[in-house]
């Protein structure tokens, strides 16, 4: 058959794949064809939900699974040999891959990001580089020594009974972190949008460094019990899979057992309370080799912050901060402590790739929010206390001034919205100013939805620190559990909780809107938020 009459698939089968195999690439372990690495952006038109086209590479060549080296873009013979190079370079930039090949069946155009001269050249089919050749170039480009190669090439954790695989951006973050640690870098910052799998990324980093014995004792720090308990049950369960040889523990009740290898703790659990010795000082300063600080913006990077004291005590350990939003203020800086992020994956990227769902904003204007409120002179509250005569606005509500009618109106507006859209059993979070506001909102919602509350009182639950409702968090996060449905909270669920069951979020507070929206944008459910 005339080559000009061949399809792209024919060119791949007859010319490109044989050339790659002849160069020594393993078909089963090192070559993947037609690799879709995004899910396709979700678009919503009224009630019709569609996914856009996925980004797909014709070939990706790997040194080892999840350590990609090259992209190969194929065209039929009616194209020039270098056609498709721009698209392939774009994909390579996204995937953090240094080598790009294009072919129309006449040979290869080879782009080498690591080359000092002749960045793009043409190769005959029998000149296609071997895996060892590209790996050697990769190592030189990245500064990977023979000594650090063992760490960099350490396998990812893989469970044949679990179909979960790291997404491309997680691989980028994991590989960059492992390479940085292998090269001797001791302070790292990873910035990944909420909902994109920071905890799973942290697990793979920890696993590879632990498995290579580069880091033998590891501390995972968070600021809330749920951000410790949930990962221990899910992403990190491997470390306690053998009940006779548990490698992971949680520091609690000031109890310290130094027989484990992976430790989880909340800041309050290791810094102690008033009247108690600082628990973390029960460990020697050199005890931990690696410390991960989850949601590191929350603990603050101030010199006197809780986690800062811990990190300075264990200053010889490699320390990795993970956050969706690095904290940069006059007095506080994550970047000053950890350095510039070694990898960033934003909310916008997550939505464009289809890993996060877009959100629709429904703004409800309440007159007191838009116009402000000023009490009449001498007006008293329900307790008989005179209200200060001044202008109040949305920043005052539910903190300096409680307008009960406003809370009732918010509950009614949202309840009416859910009824109108046949979504009364769509799991919904109400973010409130504080615990008292969350309690008032829960009461107002119960009154607005009395018919369903009578059927099951867990239809509305207040989920704030210290409340009974916190016990329902697991049920709220489980798709098969119908209750609770409407949850009010203040700070407890603002970050890190894996609640991809949520369909609606209500922001009746002015803090961290993008973070909270991002957290609920995991694309399990309809993207109508």
Show which residues each predicted segment covers.
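A short beta-strand element within the Helicase C-terminal
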Residues: 487-488, 493-510, 516
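SF2 helicase catalytic motif II
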Residues: 281-320
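ATP-dependent helicase/translocase motor core
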Residues: 1-217, 222, 226-242, 258-262, ...
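Conserved two-lobed SF2 helicase motor
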Residues: 259-273, 480-495
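Interdomain helical connector at the RecA1-RecA2 junction of SF1/SF2 helicase-like NTPases
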Residues: 332-426
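Conserved small/polar residues in nucleotide/adenosyl-binding loops
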Residues: 515-521
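Conserved helicase ATPase core of P-loop NTP-dependent helicases/translocases
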Residues: 461-489
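Conserved helicase motor "Helicase C" RecA-like lobe of SF1/SF2 P-loop NTPases
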Residues: 434-461
